[in-house]
Amino acid sequence: MVLIVLGAVMVGLLAAAAPAAERFALPEFKSGYERPTTEVPEPRDYTLDWVDVTVLAVGLGVASYLALSARSRRWIWLVMFMAFIYFGLWRGGCICAIGSVQNVTLGLCDASYAVPLVVIGFFLLPLVATLLFGRTFCAAVCPLGAIQDLVAVRPVKVPRWLDHGLGLLAYLYVGAAVLFAATGAAFIICEYDPFVALFRLIPLGRHGSTMDAFPGSLTMVAVGVAVLALGIFVARPYCRWVCPYGAVLRVLSRFSWKHVTITPDECIQCRLCEDSCPFGAIQKPNADEPSPDRVIGRRRLAILLVLVPVLLAAGGVGGWALGPPMARMHYTVRQADRVRLEEVGRVEGTEDISDAFYDTQRPKEELYTEAEAIVGTFRTGGLLLGVWAGLVVGMKLIH
């Protein structure tokens, strides 16, 4: 039996290595034309992926030292610019820690998918660095933050209530990204990344890397340009209000071993930093503010605690109702919808998505059953996403 298997493998390898025979005779040209040889780019060396992980680890270490010990904004700018060149222009924004959330989620929910070790490294290294030294990944190593910092030439101060409210979007985004990744429907963080398409406009990548083609749509290029235009006046809008990985790091940073602080023995109490920080990261001390009325505070807290279950229930119902529309992001559901429309005669002709199903020669009922199961999964996932949204809104109101 072993010899049979080995023989089959050898035959397959020899067949793959042999030159393919032409199906039709080639024409004979009298003009001296020579048929070009078909060239296939070599796959990227896997060891280079570990070079990316090493660069990430070194960048996190250097950025942490510069932020906590050297306290040098100028050198942090240099690290940030190098990260922009390497992870942004050279690697085309892929692989990135932000999108790795989806790979890890899919790996946990789909036993047939194995998360590459490199992706796990990109996912874990910034998390560990945040628990130790704060959000140094966001400060200096993330290419998405770097490109926004490069255009923030005239930042204005965003009102705290608006900044606080828009911060909800990132938590809702990470919840939606987890749902779509867990169901195998889409990696929405990667599909709707506003900067990857811009990164890949400049082909600095190696031969045979992801930089050989421009995959970004014109729509995402326009979105990226719009975000950068906003970033001229609002520092890092994507990082502050949309980035899903940043939302995770924001929570973890509350438990960091060390934080960047204003050194008390060097501070002269000028309080200029409170208004000069373009990101609104410095919270003003409230020593000069009058003490709040405890009775009013308790009453407000009681009302909010009663409101939280209402928000959870409303979010759950809304998410459950949105399950079927969200399920259309899944290829199988879209395929089943198209085949059903063709079956009842509501559309004429076929499309590629339905032709792909017909080529499998599977029964239509099997496709419909599979699609209904996916819709049911999205209803459950939508309910959980809605509860998560209600919880986030409730916690924001209490905070």
What are these regions (language model features)?
Residues 1:
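Active-site/substrate-binding loop(s) of hydrolase catalytic cores
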